[in-house]
C-alpha cells in the first residue's frame, strides 16, 4: 500500500491490460482514432463491454499524493461516463474514489459505479455498511507490527527457529463484505483503541519498525508494535517517512549508526534499495514487512501473499460486476514489490486466469477477457 504523501504534479499512468479473450494495442474510439486530449488516460468509447466481458482501462498512479489520487478519479469520470467499477488498491485510494463520486453526485440509490477496495480505512468500512462500497480485501497491519517485534525479540534471544525455511511468515488477507463488516470493524476498534505507549526499558534491546509512509494503516501497525514491546519487555521505535525514499534511507542509516538490535522495514523501492538494506543486514537483524525485498539479505518477510490478495480483490470485482464492464485501477505506485504483485493478481483473477505470480502484463498493451 504505499501510504505517504509526496507532491508530484504530473499524472502518472501505467496501462494494465487484461489478457484473456483478446489482446490489442491502445484502445481507440469508434472511428479508429486514438484519444490524445491530454492527461494520458485511455479512451474506449464505442467499444461496449459484452456480457461477462471485462475491460481494464488502465492503472492510475499518484505517488501517494492524495490530491492526485482524487484527481485521477475525477479524470476517469470525465473521460469514461460508463465506467462500471473503480478499484482502490492502496488504503487511501478508496476514500479518494468515494469523495470524487460523492462530489460528482454518483453515489447513493442510483449509483452506477461499483467501488471495490483494499484495506480498512474508516471511510471504506462505512461505505460497505452504507452500500456504496461492494467489499474490501483487508490485511492485518496490527499483526504486521506485533509479529515483527516478536520475531526480532526471538532472534535476539537466540531462537532462530522462528524463521521458516521459505523465509515468509504469512499473515493472510481476507475479504470483507456487508455481512461481515460489523464484526470486523468492532474487532479492529478493540485492537487500536486507547493510547498505550512503549516506555523505555533500561538495559533491554531496542527494535525499530520502519514504514513506507504516513497513513492510518501504519497507525494500526504501530499499535501492534507497542503491544508486543510491552508484552515482551523490549524497546520499540516506529518511524514513518513522510518524504519518500530519501527520508526512509536517512532513517535506516541513522538506525545503523545508533546500533539498534533489529530493524523491520517496508521498502519503498526494493529494487533500488538492495545496497542500503544489505548495509543494514551487515550491522543488525533485518526483516521486511508489508512489502518484501527478496534480493536483499533480509532474514524473513512478514506479511500477506500480495498476489493471492490481489486475486481475492479480482473475485470481488467479478461478484460486483457479473455482466462485466469497464474497470479502472488506482494505486500509489508500481515500483514496490507488493504493488506489482497485488495489481497482477487482480488482473489474473478478473480474467479467470490460472494463478501465476511470475506473470506481469506489459504496460503497452490493452488486454480484455471474460
Residue ranges of model-derived segments:
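A residue-level marker of the well-folded mature domains of exported/periplasmic proteins
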Residues: 21-370
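Low-complexity, intrinsically disordered short peptide segments enriched in small/polar/basic residues
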Residues: 1-2, 15, 41
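C-terminal motif of bacterial Sec signal peptides marking the signal peptidase cleavage site
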Residues: 16-20
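Bacterial N-terminal signal peptides that target proteins for export
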Residues: 1-9
